[in-house]
Regions:
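Short sequence/structural segments immediately N-terminal
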Residues: 1-112
């Protein structure tokens, strides 16, 4: 089923995070038990979607999983982010709005 993610994986391999972060580092919570709950939930949802071939191409991140990824941006970069003036941002709710290509180009990120 992972062949669906080939384009996203290849784009990640070309990006700046490939040497320091895996898929789970960005897309799964770091805390227990959320880590295992989200892993199980995504495993089920991905298996179902891929088996039934019911997913958009290119693959798109859900709003929930986007919130997990943004939380993980702040998990790793929070100290630095607090030093930067994010003009026009009242809350850091979506790092990918301005940094869409940081994880793996713009494939499946920050798009409706």
């Amino acid at each position: 089923n992972c062949h669906v993610m080939n384009d996203v994986h290849d784009a990640w391999a070309r990006g700046p995070h490939h040497a320091v972060a895996t898929c789970n580092d960005c897309h799964i919570p770091h805390e227990f038990p959320a880590k295992y709950i989200v892993k199980a939930m995504n495993g089920w949802n991905h298996s179902l979607a891929f088996t039934l071939e019911n997913y958009p191409e290119p693959i798109q991140i859900t709003q929930f999983n986007k919130s997990v990824a943004v939380a993980n941006c702040l998990y790793c970069h929070g100290d630095f982010v607090s030093l930067v003036n994010h003009e026009g941002q009242t809350e850091l709710e979506d790092c990918t709005r301005c940094h869409a290509s940081i994880g793996h180009d713009e494939i499946g990120v920050g798009k409706p």
